[in-house]
Amino acid sequence: MTNILSPEKSEHDQELPIRPSYLKEFVGQQQIKENLLVFIKAAKSRNEHLDHTLFYGPPGLGKTTLAKIISNEIGGNFKSTAGPAIIKAADLASILTNLEKNDVLFIDEIHRLNTLVEEVLYSAMEDFELDIIIGEGSAARPVKITLPKFTLIGATTRFGLISNPLRDRFGIPMRLNFYNTEELKQVLNRASKLLDIDLTDSGSEEIAKRSRGTPRIALRLLRRIRDFAVVDGKSRIDKEICDFGLKRLTVDSIGLDSNDYRYLKFIADNYHGGPVGIETIAAALSEQRDELEETIEPYLIKIGLVKRTPRGRVITIAAFEHLKMPIPNKSQNQLNILNENE
């Protein structure tokens, strides 16, 4: 699934030279910032490495940015890889043996590490030692390599898929949450200054309200609306041009797009609001289950349009109202599910 509202990274997102370098520049996640500042100062005062850190939560909220900030704050080199890229234990050993003291090793999608790689990582995280086998067959022998004191930072959108032994080795687990409108406005205002964009307060608010609580999406929308403004001959990005551009991008007033409507209407039209299993939804929409669970559902659940129940997904009365569809005649049991927590 590729669309303007996807919180996943794209190569074009990296073109924006606006990533903050230090905690004081990072907008949002206030409690995380304050706690990180304490942990970093304490580690530096003791002349120790920062404890291994795990960032988890929906995509697009700043996990990679915070990892780079930590590297800058502690004065180490930043080395980055991803769980799927580390196929063999030897791949991990090669990375670890090239680290220096106070380096930060960032592993994105850490929940996708395979078991053999994880087992090598345990002793590296806990004892800063690497146990590897050199040679083959009868000539094989174990070798223990001492590693420098480094900080491992893991990032995941699927916290529940990380094994307990690996999860327990992170001294600093931190959940990143969706941003509110005011925080997203701050992100947009900072970006507009760095990019020399004349963005009005009403313009930043309009983009923020439709950005699904996600900075990555907000910045992507800002860049696309700038395109509409340039072609339309406007030097200032205000609410009017934002509304025009967002409608052209099929982003509605609360940040839903055609993929969200497909999801909601499938459940509404075919299952009278649900419940319906996620595998059925994925098959009907020709989407991967992971894509639905990581890209579409988190925001729909956050704003109260979808609920996950033991029997499957259910869209709420608020969803029917937003779709401007009549609420179906359902059994009292089904209505109880729809009305739950409304």
UniProtKB/Swiss-Prot annotation:
Region (Head domain (RuvB-H)) spans which residues?
A: 253-342
Compartment(s): Cytoplasm
Q: Provide the GO biological process annotations.
A: DNA recombination; DNA repair
Q: Where is this region: Small ATPAse domain (RuvB-S)?
A: 180-250
EC id? 3.6.4.-
Q: Which UniProt keywords apply?
A: ATP-binding, Cytoplasm, DNA damage, DNA recombination, DNA repair, DNA-binding, Hydrolase, Nucleotide-binding
What residues bind ATP, as annotated? 18-19, 60, 63-65, 126-128, 169, 179, 216
User: Which Pfam family is one of this chain's hits?
Assistant: AAA_lid_4
Q: Which GO terms describe its cellular component?
A: cytoplasm; Holliday junction resolvase complex
Its catalytic activity?
ATP + H2O = ADP + phosphate + H(+)
* GO MF, one example: four-way junction helicase activity
What residues does Mg(2+) bind to? 64
Instruction: Please indicate if the UniProt record lists Flavoprotein as a keyword.
Output: no
The UniProt record gives the binding positions of DNA as 289, 308, 313
Provide the residue span(s) of the region labelled Large ATPase domain (RuvB-L): 1-179
Highest taxon, organism lineage: Bacteria
For the protein in the UniProt heading, the enzyme class is hydrolase
What is this protein's function per UniProt?
A: Participates in UV-tolerance of Synechocystis PCC 6803.
Q: What is known about its subunit structure? A: Homohexamer. Forms an RuvA(8)-RuvB(12)-Holliday junction (HJ) complex. HJ DNA is sandwiched between 2 RuvA tetramers; dsDNA enters through RuvA and exits via RuvB. An RuvB hexamer assembles on each DNA strand where it exits the tetramer. Each RuvB hexamer is contacted by two RuvA subunits (via domain III) on 2 adjacent RuvB subunits; this complex drives branch migration. In the full resolvosome a probable DNA-RuvA(4)-RuvB(12)-RuvC(2) complex forms which resolves the HJ.
What PANTHER family does the record point to? HOLLIDAY JUNCTION BRANCH MIGRATION COMPLEX SUBUNIT RUVB (PTHR42848:SF1), PTHR42848
Protein name as it appears in the record: Holliday junction branch migration complex subunit RuvB
**Which organism was this protein described from?**
Rickettsia prowazekii (strain Madrid E)
